[in-house]
A protein has these predicted regions:
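Proline- and acidic/polar-enriched loop/turn elements at helix boundaries
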Residues: 25, 68, 94-95, 158, ...
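Conserved beta-strand termini and adjacent loop/short-helix elements that scaffold enzyme active sites
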Residues: 27, 39, 93-95, 246, ...
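Structured beta->alpha junctions
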Residues: 38, 72, 96, 130-131, ...
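Well-ordered alpha-helical segments embedded in enzymatic catalytic cores
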Residues: 45-48, 52, 106, 229, ...
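Conserved helicase C-terminal RecA-like lobe
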Residues: 62, 76-88, 101, 108-349
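Conserved helicase motor
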Residues: 70-73, 93-102, 230
């Protein structure tokens, strides 16, 4: 890494109590200042970072040598959406693309079946997910009956129950599933509840949320965070139909080409790797340092998070961007956020501070650069107010 990047990283990690103080030196030149960027919200952060990547491309940087490092895997969604929109190829290193993650496909399958009772692929995926004592032999029986009578799998299941052709134990689970699907469809069509509340009902009433919460491990915690991020994504659409169309489009775009790609990964997964340009988004309290880490491990947890920040910064050989947003969209609601305590630990002399805001009065995405917040007449959210106090 350049000397500026190492100076920032050294200053940060020096705040750990259980560390012998040392100053890192490099054979590389001083290099560019570390960029500290403040955005209005998470969507603007994704736009700003993608714009910066485009600028680096024009300067002949390789996409393979550009990386975005996030604290938690659910954070990739906003960047994936943006990259798909502008046609910027990307890869998830050490992970799976957002809409291809198992729990996201499960949620989408529930919504697809509620929306369209003839969606046999969706039915197949969720009929026994979570487990409802519906075995492979019963599923095979439903498929054969469906094919023979030219019925959808859902209608075939109903008919088999009517004809008393399903085993008693299996019948209870299958009947319960079909009744829930009918209830959720009624919620959507008759009660006209919105698509976000619909998915929340599905997750609670199907037992899917309980299934993930009952097995407390990192994988299931990540799955729950991904589902929360899905609920946030759904808020961007007016109704269920437009959301499902978006998912169909996002999953049909072929990104598996052999050319260069931007790297998206977690900080944990970046250990041992280096890139010319590194973006470190989401440096906000609760997200990074992660609230759970501090709650469970106290000071040790905080120091682990700080070491992770150190790892993230030192993955950059030439240029490092640290950024945070003043507002985040979380489970369908705007929440105010504030810059991570780690931001305060970065040495001023090695930083270039910028505030960015998309100009919403114009059609194109345009940035107001380094303007004072007062001039931009932004919404005075609690996050905005706290940030003002910090910079004055």
């Amino acid at each position: 890494s350049s000397q500026n990047i190492l100076s920032v990283a050294s200053n940060l990690i020096a705040n750990n109590q259980n560390r012998v103080g040392k100053t890192l030196k490099t054979t590389m030149e001083e290099g560019e200042l570390v960029k500290l960027n403040c955005f209005k919200n998470g969507k603007d952060e994704a736009i700003g970072i993608s714009d910066e990547i485009e600028k680096k491309l024009k300067k002949k940087y390789s996409l393979n040598n550009i990386s975005i490092l996030v604290r938690a895997i659910f954070q990739t969604r906003e960047f994936e959406e943006r990259f798909l929109k502008i046609g910027l190829p990307y890869r998830i290193l050490g992970g799976i693309k957002f809409y291809e993650r198992a729990e996201i496909k499960d949620c989408v399958a529930y919504l697809r079946l509620i929306h369209q009772d003839k969606d046999d692929l969706a039915f197949d995926r969720i009929v026994n997910n979570p487990k409802r004592s519906i075995g492979e032999s019963t599923i095979k029986q439903i498929h054969e009956f469906s094919k023979k009578n030219s019925l959808s799998l859902e209608l075939a299941s109903k008919k088999l129950i009517e004809l008393n052709l399903i085993k008693p134990k299996t019948k209870i689970g299958l009947n319960s599933f079909l009744n829930f699907v009918a209830k959720w469809r009624n919620d959507l069509i008759v009660k006209k509840i919105n698509h976000i509340k619909l998915l929340q009902n599905v997750l609670d009433e199907s037992g899917y949320s309980a299934m993930l919460k009952n097995k407390k491990d990192l994988e299931n915690e990540n799955r729950l965070e991904n589902i929360k991020e899905l609920l946030s994504a759904m808020k961007e659409f007016d109704n269920l139909e437009s959301f499902l169309e978006h998912v169909a489009l996002a999953t049909s775009i072929d990104q598996d080409w052999e050319g260069e790609k931007v790297n998206l990964m977690t900080m944990h997964g970046s250990k041992g790797l280096e890139f010319d340009v590194v973006f470190l988004p989401g440096w906000e309290e609760g997200l990074f340092p992660h609230q759970k880490s501090i709650e469970e491990k106290g000071q040790n947890g905080l120091e682990e998070e700080r070491r992770l920040a150190y790892v993230g910064l030192t993955r950059a050989k030439k240029i490092a961007f640290v950024s945070f947003a003043l507002n985040r969209f979380f489970q369908g609601n705007w929440i105010d956020s504030i810059a991570s305590r780690f931001v305060d630990e970065l040495p001023e002399k090695n930083l270039e501070k910028n505030t960015f805001f998309v100009n919403e009065d114009k059609n194109e995405e345009d940035f107001e650069f380094n303007q004072d917040f007062e001039e931009q007449n932004e919404t005075r959210s609690p996050g905005w107010i706290r940030y003002q106090k910090r910079i004055k």
